[in-house]
Amino acid sequence: MNGVSFHRLYTPYVKIQIDYGITVDVSVDQNEWADLPFEKYDCVVFNRWLGKLQYNILPVLAKKKIPFIVDIDDYWVLPKYNPAYKFYRAYIKNGIKDSLHYADAVMVTTPQLEEKVKEFNQNVTIIPNALDYNQSQWKAETEHPFTIGWVGGLSHTEDLKLLSDKIKPICEKYGARFLMCGFHENVPEWATMEKAITGEPRHKRPEWFQTRVGTKANEFGKYYSEIDICVAPLQKTQFNRYKSELKILEAAAYKLPIFVSAVEPYTNHRDNLGCFFVKNNDWSEIGKLIKSDKVKEVGEINYQYCDQHHNLDTINKKRVDLLRKVVG
């Protein structure tokens, strides 16, 4: 199960089944979707599109008068540097646009994405991301040196270039470690991302730089237990504008402060005093926070803000209200 399905479908609907007594059946195998007994369901919810079987399944739902909701958390037009660009352009982009157009309702993560989706469907509801803090991945405890950390995937090569020559002087001055989480040793792009941080080839990796290998969506959260300050650089692009603020929430789960590029969608958290907005690519404020000895205090502020504005119970109520409205 990928991260999107885990956060947008699995986590919220497991809790909905428990809290609301609503029966939720889950299928993650596309090969079985064509044979599902759709007539037994009041509503179908899926992320983005239904893959290769979409144009077989949508007519079945229409014939049986079963409403469906599309949950989407990012833009369907990828930048050319994204590893999935060609595949999306050839096979996925138009499928997503069609699913949005025919959906009875669409759930999105941010006002920015709501604006874009309304080009295809006016029945759009903002359902922000939220984490279930009771999951074990958000409860790990570790002993570690003071650490600045980044957690992410392969598509962030261009974003990490924003940290070039920025992290090294901070780590060396304050004796901090930098931890890159999501790493895969034999993938060339990761070597590029590492060099963007260290300025050195892998065989000259400095002592202050360490990595953690990529893992499953229900396990990666534990990496935040090794971090004291998070960073989330993000290029100002149309694609990134329609992403969500999930990295801020993940940092908040471990009561960590986070430094983010001052671009949308991160600026949706402009009132979050546990989140620092980096302008003109000047990351030196990280050092000032370390020196102030208020790292934990500011991390607590991030947690309190996210618990108020991205509370899973509150957001799930909104989710259930929409489900009931669509079902009628």
Descriptions of predicted regions:
Residues 12, 293-324:
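A charged, aromatic-enriched C-terminal amphipathic alpha-helix characteristic of glycosyltransferases
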Residues 112, 130:
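Carbohydrate-associated surface elements
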Residues 44-45, 101-110, 179:
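A short beta-strand/loop micro-motif in the catalytic core of glycosyltransferases
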Residues 1-21, 131-136, 141-225:
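Conserved catalytic-core segment of nucleotide-activated headgroup transferases in glycan assembly
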